[in-house]
């Protein structure tokens, strides 16, 4: 059975149904070379023009962001982490959110992991040069597309605590 998925490439948003296995979405996507969308709609980022297709194969590397809805993965595999509030730029996108890493690793360690897509929680997603932003609980960012990463706090936050308030 398929599930809805929204992903963002450099020039469009892709919305459709994908066939994925059980487990965390990030694990599933990181194992694929091509993501196949069924009943897909592509919306151009520049003018909003939409095109619908029955089936669309997208090379995983072309995707910049993937929205995560509902999938939290196996609770048994979770481990204690600290959060780092960071702003990343990838393609036309600017994302501010929390990266998670084990307490004993270096800052921004999540961006040097083996996984192509890494999760960012409490994310605010926008495009460079545009004012509109969207908030998402979790997005997966393609770390190979990141051109800049800027920490927003010098001190990481224990993930068991709520994130610090953002300055106005």
Question: Language-model features: where?
Answer:
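Conserved RNA-binding domains used in RNP assembly and mRNA/RNA metabolism
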Residues: 1-168
């Amino acid at each position: 059975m398929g599930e809805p998925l929204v992903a963002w490439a450099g020039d469009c948003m892709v919305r459709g149904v994908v066939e994925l296995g059980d487990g965390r979405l990030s694990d599933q996507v990181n194992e694929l070379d091509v993501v196949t969308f069924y009943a897909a709609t592509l919306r151009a980022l520049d003018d909003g023009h939409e095109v619908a297709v029955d089936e669309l194969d997208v090379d995983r590397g072309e995707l910049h962001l993937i929205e995560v809805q509902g999938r939290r993965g196996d609770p048994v595999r979770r481990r204690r982490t600290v959060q780092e509030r960071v702003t990343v730029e990838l393609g036309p996108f600017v994302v501010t959110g929390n990266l998670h890493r084990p307490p004993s690793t270096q800052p921004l360690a999540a961006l040097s992991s083996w996984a192509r897509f890494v999760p960012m929680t409490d994310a605010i997603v926008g495009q460079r040069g545009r004012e509109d932003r969207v908030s998402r609980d979790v997005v997966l960012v393609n770390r190979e597309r990141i051109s800049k990463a800027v920490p927003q706090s010098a001190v990481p936050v224990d993930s068991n605590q709520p994130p610090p308030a953002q300055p106005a």
